[in-house]
């Protein structure tokens, strides 16, 4: 069974229940995620013992706002479209992934999942050697790509196929405003001599990015280049803490099969679809152990 046949087999009441959005559940998740960021940031700011270690915790919390950004650009985090768009813009700003541009990018990824010629997530390929793997999870290529894209968009040189011509002015304005705000915050920090943002935002984000790279690689890494979402996307079985941090996106095959299902309904969808999943892993450690074993320069020595 492929994902289309599965969705076609759902009853009208099942579809209605699975796609029901909730401001309350979204706001509860938002309050928890940002509440932890403010709490940990406050502990770093006052210099509690071990505050240096807390920068990594802060970084993981901040960089995993990517998963909330992802949920909001689908407009499934909240029932309110305006709330989705405002939160998306905030999350995108904090992690240097502008929300309007990312919506175009991500929708192209959904239309062409695991299509080597059209899926923008496959641009540049996946790591195939130990060195490529280490560089990938460092997050450095990601930061380079994000800042490069931001400057290209701001200059009006956004010519990627997934951004429609009538959307390019919007993407450009978003990039210009973002760069102006980043510049303003940097200037205020330098002039005032206060380095708070460096320790509660910038350095933590650098420390947190590798954890997001490790997480995201499991979503489609080593999945086949086919159209069936039950094969080309991976569900990773993990603990409740990771699912909460990632807004239930470890249920990734479920999300790709039925993208209009909000994060809080994905466990329900999983219970219905789990017997048909073809790409799963028993945790992120298991996934990466298998991935490393099958890297080209590792497997050739076995």
Q: Can you annotate each of these PLM segments?
A:
Residues 59-72, 98-101, 143-149, 201-227:
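Transmembrane alpha-helical segments that form the membrane-embedded catalytic/substrate-channel core
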Residues 65-75, 102-114, 215-222, 245-261:
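Histidine-centered catalytic micro-motifs
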Residues 1-61, 93-198, 263-302:
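Non-catalytic, topology-defining segments of multipass membrane proteins
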